[in-house]
UniProtKB/Swiss-Prot annotation:
Adds the second galactose to the lacto-N-tetraose chain in lipooligosaccharide (LOS). It holds the Pfam family Glyco_transf_25. This is Lacto-N-neotetraose biosynthesis glycosyltransferase LgtB. Its EC number is 2.-.-.-. The keyword Transferase applies. The keyword Transmembrane helix does not apply. Keywords: Glycosyltransferase, Lipopolysaccharide biosynthesis, Transferase. The gene is lgtB. GO terms for molecular function: glycosyltransferase activity.
Length: 275
């Protein structure tokens, strides 16, 4: 398994955290130098996601985060890799992580590497909906299909066809069609045309910041991007087509049925545990 950890070259504390975390499990990994607002970022956007440069409200740091994932995918495609595992440098790993990340026979037995798929390894401790996938459990963890929004890109496996799928579509989208990369991958902002996303349950990893928040603890690593993400998600909701008069009218007329659906979803939603 090729495990890539996106990290700023200057992030000594986070890189030490990753070396310790992966080292304790005996998991091989390599750092991928994250992009930051720079000429390199502008060149990458022009080549791969031209609409992102003119995005009306994503910050420079959010654009750099988006493009760090996109450039890593492009590198993997150029190297002819069938799939890669991608992490961010504030990730925590769960019990037995080496059984998933130091070998890949389990993956090849459950997923066709010539198809488009994502295995989401992370939980953000959000309430989510899933459905059965038919994929066999492995080491006490299940692979249900993710059926609702689930933020974060701190840990996932992505196949070659899935990388190509996203890069091809990102390249063609206008600025208003683009959103933070985690929402493009794991929400309904973007039509994935049925490409499956399996949510590992229990999750194998979590961001240190969100793990700390969920357990009412202080974060040791913090986040360079969290403030921007929260502001921009509020802006997305304001700019959403759902805020037009037509959509507000439709929402008013369908309020009762939507409330029923919300109640049903609340009964079925759950927080993916991390262990």
């Amino acid at each position: 398994m090729q495990n890539h950890v996106i990290s700023l070259a200057s992030a000594a504390e986070r890189r030490a955290h990753i070396a310790d975390t992966f080292g304790r499990h005996g998991i091989p990994f390599q750092f991928f130098d994250a992009l930051m607002p720079s000429e390199r970022l502008e060149q990458a956007m022009a080549e791969l996601v031209p609409g992102l440069s003119a995005h009306p409200y994503l910050s420079g740091v959010e654009k750099a985060c988006f493009m760090s994932h996109a450039v890593l995918w492009k590198q993997a495609l150029d190297e002819g890799l069938p799939y890669i595992t991608v992490f961010e440098d504030d990730v925590l790993l769960g019990e037995g992580a080496e059984k998933f990340l130091a070998e890949d026979a389990w993956l090849q037995e459950r997923f066709d590497p010539d198809t488009a798929f994502i295995v989401r390894l992370e939980t953000m401790f959000m309430h989510v909906l899933t459905s059965p996938s038919g994929v066999a459990d492995y080491c006490g963890r299940a692979f249900p299909l993710l059926e609702s929004e689930h933020w974060g890109t701190a840990g996932y496996i992505i196949s070659r066809k899935a990388m190509r799928f996203f890069l091809d579509r990102f390249a063609a989208l206008p600025p208003e069609g683009l959103h933070p990369v985690d929402l493009m991958m794991f929400s309904d902002f973007f039509d994935r045309e049925g490409m499956p996303v399996c949510q590992l349950n229990p999750a194998l990893c979590a961001q240190e910041l969100h793990y700390a928040k969920f357990h009412d603890q202080n974060s040791a690593l913090g986040s360079l991007i969290e403030h921007d993400r929260l502001l921009n998600r509020k802006q997305q909701r304001r700019d959403s087509p759902a805020n037009t008069f037509k959509h507000r009218l439709i929402r008013a007329l369908t309020k009762i049925s939507r409330e029923r659906e919300k109640r049903r979803q609340r009964r079925e939603q759950f927080i993916v545990p991390f262990q």
